[in-house]
Amino acid sequence: LQIHRAVSAAQSVVLAHSVGHDVQQQVADVLFARASADGRLSASLGGLFPTGAGVTITPHTPTHFNPEEYGMSSVALRRIDSIAKRGIQEGAYPGCQIVILKDGKTMYDHAFGTHAGKGSALVRPTDLYDLASLSKTTGTLLALMKLYDRGRFNLSDKLSDYLPWLQRTNKKDMTIRELLLHQSGLPAGIVLYPEAIDKESYKGRLFSARKDALHPLRLGVTTWANPNFHFKPETLSRTRNANYTLQICDSLWLNKSFIKVIQEKIIEAPLGTKQYRYSDVGFILLRFLAEQLAGMPMDEYLAREFYEPMGLERTLYLPLQRIPKAQIVPSANDKFLRKCVLQGFVHDESAAFQGGVSGNAGLFS
């Protein structure tokens, strides 16, 4: 009777058919999701659990812990709720998810608000987000570390030894180490969209310092834009076909030959001194390097070597190929260039114009 009451009141129960030390250790590991358990009851247990009852636990199953056991305060963590809700009320963001880990243990994991304001989907703990520049360290850098460990390159190697299109340029002597340290002299970024816009399709200038009839769209404090332009038909298409294969939003496909335009823009980019300057361009080049060394697209290499073996099924590039759009939080409402809400498509322009996989951005999780 006492056991019946105890089991009825328990939040979870692990059934083990032995009191041996090894079994006790296995049960402890299951409780902390350090070991797997996938058994099912072969017979009912006194009205408590029916035949076939059971859940599957794997080392990837999320678990929660008492913050006080790790030197943290539950009271202090609960204050985060009010801060997150105030941000939503003041319009700073429509929703968010906040996760706090300590020593690999989940101390706090809560979702707030909606994807895009009133009437849109609620934020869920399993939703995906555009990781933006975190793609550099959680994507590109991982690929290069693996390739380095396999002896495929040295940090002192010149990038042009692997990317021949750089050999007759002022970038021919840049080393891989310089790119990783953001000390190559490359600029912070390159602007690609002017190469896709038909300059004959709009009147006047594309941007203005003040709002007027031609520039109704505000992009910044002193920047107003003319959104009434068309793309070059040889660059972008409203339908997919054999040449237009790189999707950059719901209804725009980029010509796969645009990669040559990107290479030209990198070649033309001015070089500064070898001092620290954070550069997306350097990591765009490192993606080209990773693919050259791996012999396959970087997103496929990362999935094979890291994400799939680690059970990170919801960490990936090009998420719409595997994840329903409703499970991806919108990144932005692009009223100027792509003229749509970006949901499942990378926000970063440089990554978008590479089809969604880039060394500087593109990863979702």
Ranges and model annotations:
Residues L41, N154-S156, A294-E300:
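Short, charged, surface-exposed loops that flank catalytic or proteolytic processing sites
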Residues K171-S365:
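Short, surface-exposed loop or secondary-structure junction motifs
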Residues L1, A16-V19, L101-D103, F112, ...:
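Active-site-proximal beta-strand/loop segments in catalytic clefts of secreted hydrolases
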Residues E90-V99, G119-L181, A269-G282, S358-A361:
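Short active-site loop at a secondary-structure junction
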Residues Q24, A28, L77, D81, ...:
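Extracytoplasmic/secreted envelope proteins and their assembly/folding machinery
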Residues F32-S36, K85, Q89-E90, M145-R152, ...:
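Sec-exported extracytoplasmic/periplasmic mature domains
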Residues E69-L131, R152-N154, K260-E268, V341:
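Short, conserved catalytic-motif segment at the N-terminal edge
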Residues L1-N66, Y70:
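C-terminal non-catalytic regions of proteins with extracellular/luminal or membrane-system context
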